[in-house]
C-alpha cells in the first residue's frame, strides 16, 4: 500500500475512530440497564446466584429456552460477557458497529470512502429511531446490531455466490455457512427479513441456480439448510409459546404503522432516490430501470414481506426495526452514488472532489452535533455519577445484606441533549420497587435501593391498610407544595405503594411544609422515617404531618 492510498484512508479512519469512540463511551459511561443487572444471574435457579462458570451459563440458557425465549445465541453472548466483564463487550460492540457500517457499504457495491460513510452515518444518526436501544444498550445491541450484522454477512455472500458468480475462498465459505446458522438462531424479525430475502432471491434466480455446478449448488443449499435449522430452533422454543400465552397473538396494524411512521424520512428519501435513479438515462452497460427493479426485488419487497408476520406479534418494538431500516439504507447508498455520478457526468466543470467534500461536511454537520454532545455529556455527568453510585454502594453497604441503601439521584436532566436519542435512561428512582432499583438491589446484594437528591429528604409513613389517595404537602400558607408518590414508571410489585405514604422534600422546607392526612388514618400509622444520604431516622408523625 503506497503513501497516497494511506492518505486517502486517513479521513475514513478518523471518522470511524471518532464514531466507535462515541459508541464505546455512551455504553461504558452509563449504569447497566435493568436487563443487564438481571441477566447477570442464573435464570430459573432458586435461590438464584450470579453466573460464575460455564455450567451456570448452560443451565441459564436451558431455562430461558424452556420458559422465556428461543434467542439462546444472543443471550449466551450477553450472559457470557456479563460474567467475564462488560468492558470487553463495550469494545467489541464498537468494532461491531464499524463492521455493520462497512457491510452496508459493501452490499451496496460501493467503496468504503468518506462519501458513502457520511451517508450511512447520517442515516443511522438522524433517520432511524431508538438509536440507543439498538447500539448503546448492550442487551439490545447484541439482539439487534450484532444479529443484523450477521444477517448482512450472510446476504452479502449469498448474493455474490448466486448473482455475481463469485467464487469463495475456504475462509469465506466458513464465514458464509457460519453466518447462515447464526442469523437463523439470532432473533425473530431478523430471520423474517433474511428469509424473505432468501425466498425472493431463489425465485428470481432459480433458472440460474439450475445451471450451477454440483459443488456450488451444495454450498447454497447447505447455507439455506443451516439458516432454516437455526430458524426452527429459534421459533420452536417452548419459552416462545409460554410468552404468547401471556401476551396473546392477534393481527394489528397499529405497531407496524407506528414503526413505519418513526422512519418516515428514511422511507421518503429512499423512495425519492429510487424515483430519480429510475429516470436516469441508460448507459451501454447499465439500465437504471433494471437496477431499480432489482433493488425493489432484493431489498424493498423483503422489507414489505417481513413486516407481515410481525403484525401478528404484540411485541413489535421500534428497536426491532433495525434489519428493515438497514435494507432501506443500502438502497439509499446505492442510488446516491448513481445520482451523483450522473451529476458529475453532466456538470463537467464541477470540481468533483470539492463538491463531495462539501456534501459530506453538510451531512456530518447535520448528523453529529447531538451525538458528539451526548458523548461529552457521558464523560461530564454519566461517568462521575456511575462511579459515585457504585463506590457508594461498594464502600458503604456491600456487606449490609438486608439494609435499605440510599444513593445519590441523577440530577442533570436539565443538561440532557434536547434530542436524547443516544443516552439511555438507566437512573435509579426514589421508589425502591421501580424496576431498575429492584434489579440493582439484587445485583449488589442489598435489601433495597432508593435514590435521593443531595439536598432532599425522603419521608416514608408506613400504614397497615391499603391506601393510594393523593395527599398534598402544604406550605405555611396552605398552598400545595408537592404530592405523595402513588405510582412508579414500572413498580414491582404494582401494589407496593398501597401501604406506604412516600414523598420527597427539600431539607430546608421540612419544618414549614407538612403532608395533610385525614384523622381516620392516624390510628393506622405504624412507622414514620426520614431518610437522606447520611442515613435514616424514625420521627414522630407530628414532625411531618397534620391531620384534619
Language-model features: where?
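Short, Lys/Arg-rich, polar N-terminal cytosolic tail immediately upstream
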Residues: 1-6
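Intrinsically disordered, polar/acidic, low-complexity terminal segments
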Residues: 7-68, 82-100, 108-113, 215, ...
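Alpha-helical transmembrane segments
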Residues: 8-22, 116-123, 222-228, 301
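Transmembrane catalytic cores of multi-pass membrane glycosyltransferases
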Residues: 24-87, 91, 138-141, 173, ...
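Transmembrane alpha-helical segments
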Residues: 97-108, 150-162, 195-203, 271-276, ...
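Membrane-interface micro-motifs in multi-pass membrane enzymes
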Residues: 118-159, 264-270, 305-335
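Short hydrophobic alpha-helices at membrane interfaces in multi-pass membrane enzymes
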Residues: 160-181
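Signature aromatic-anchored transmembrane alpha helix within multi-pass, membrane-resident enzymes
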Residues: 172-174, 288, 341-371
Amino acid at each position: 500500500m503506497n503513501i497516497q492510498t494511506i492518505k486517502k484512508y486517513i479521513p475514513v479512519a478518523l471518522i470511524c475512530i471518532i464514531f466507535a469512540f462515541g459508541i464505546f463511551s455512551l455504553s461504558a459511561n452509563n449504569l447497566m440497564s435493568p436487563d443487564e443487572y438481571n441477566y447477570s444471574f442464573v435464570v430459573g435457579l432458586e435461590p438464584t446466584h450470579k453466573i460464575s462458570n460455564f455450567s451456570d451459563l448452560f443451565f441459564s440458557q436451558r431455562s430461558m429456552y424452556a420458559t422465556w425465549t428461543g434467542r439462546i445465541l444472543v443471550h449466551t453472548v450477553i450472559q457470557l460477557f456479563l460474567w467475564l466483564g462488560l468492558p470487553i463487550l463495550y469494545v467489541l460492540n464498537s468494532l461491531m458497529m464499524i463492521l455493520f457500517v462497512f457491510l452496508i457499504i459493501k452490499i451496496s457495491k460501493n467503496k468504503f470512502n468518506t462519501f458513502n460513510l457520511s451517508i450511512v452515518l447520517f442515516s443511522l444518526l438522524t433517520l432511524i429511531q431508538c438509536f440507543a436501544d439498538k447500539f448503546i444498550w448492550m442487551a439490545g445491541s447484541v439482539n439487534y446490531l450484532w444479529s443484523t450484522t450477521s444477517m448482512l454477512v450472510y446476504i452479502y455472500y449469498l448474493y455474490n455466490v448466486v448473482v455475481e458468480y463469485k467464487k469463495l475462498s475456504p475462509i469465506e465459505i466458513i464465514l458464509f455457512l457460519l453466518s447462515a446458522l447464526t442469523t437463523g438462531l439470532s432473533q425473530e424479525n431478523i430471520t423474517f427479513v433474511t428469509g424473505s430475502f432468501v425466498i425472493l432471491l431463489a425465485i428470481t434466480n432459480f433458472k440460474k441456480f439450475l445451471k450451477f455446478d454440483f459443488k456450488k449448488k451444495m454450498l447454497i443449499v447447505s447455507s439455506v439448510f443451516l439458516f432454516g435449522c437455526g430458524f426452527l430452533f429459534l421459533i420452536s422454543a417452548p419459552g416462545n409459546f409460554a410468552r404468547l400465552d401471556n401476551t396473546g397473538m392477534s393481527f394489528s396494524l397499529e405497531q407496524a404503522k407506528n414503526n413505519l411512521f418513526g422512519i418516515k424520512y428514511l422511507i421518503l428519501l429512499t423512495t425519492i432516490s429510487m424515483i430519480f435513479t429510475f429516470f436516469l438515462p441508460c448507459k451501454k452497460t447499465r439500465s437504471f430501470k433494471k437496477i431499480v427493479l432489482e433493488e425493489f426485488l432484493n431489498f424493498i419487497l423483503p422489507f414489505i414481506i417481513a413486516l407481515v408476520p410481525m403484525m401478528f406479534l404484540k411485541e413489535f418494538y421500534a428497536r426491532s426495526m433495525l434489519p428493515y431500516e438497514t435494507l432501506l439504507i443500502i438502497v439509499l447508498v446505492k442510488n446516491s452514488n448513481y445520482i451523483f455520478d450522473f451529476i458529475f457526468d453532466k456538470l463537467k466543470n464541477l470540481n468533483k472532489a470539492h463538491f463531495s467534500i462539501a456534501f459530506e461536511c453538510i451531512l456530518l454537520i447535520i448528523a453529529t452535533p447531538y451525538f458528539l454532545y451526548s458523548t461529552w455529556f457521558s464523560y461530564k455527568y454519566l461517568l462521575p455519577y456511575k462511579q459515585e453510585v457504585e463506590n457508594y454502594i461498594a464502600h458503604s453497604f456491600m456487606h449490609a445484606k438486608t439494609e435499605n441503601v440510599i444513593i445519590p439521584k441523577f440530577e442533570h436532566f436539565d443538561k440532557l441533549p434536547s434530542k436524547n436519542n443516544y443516552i439511555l435512561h438507566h437512573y435509579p428512582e426514589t421508589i425502591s420497587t421501580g424496576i431498575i432499583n429492584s434489579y440493582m438491589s439484587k445485583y449488589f446484594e442489598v435489601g433495597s435501593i432508593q435514590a435521593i437528591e443531595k439536598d432532599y429528604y425522603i419521608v416514608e409513613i408506613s400504614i397497615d391498610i391499603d391506601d393510594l389517595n393523593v395527599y398534598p404537602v402544604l406550605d405555611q400558607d396552605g398552598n400545595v407544595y408537592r404530592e405523595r408518590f402513588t405510582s412508579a414508571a414500572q413498580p414491582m410489585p404494582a401494589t407496593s405503594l398501597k401501604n406506604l405514604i412516600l414523598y420527597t422534600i427539600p431539607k430546608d422546607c421540612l419544618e414549614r411544609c407538612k403532608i395533610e392526612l385525614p384523622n381516620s388514618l392516624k390510628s393506622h400509622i405504624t412507622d414514620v422515617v426520614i431518610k437522606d444520604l447520611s442515613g435514616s431516622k424514625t420521627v414522630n408523625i407530628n414532625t411531618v404531618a397534620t391531620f384534619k
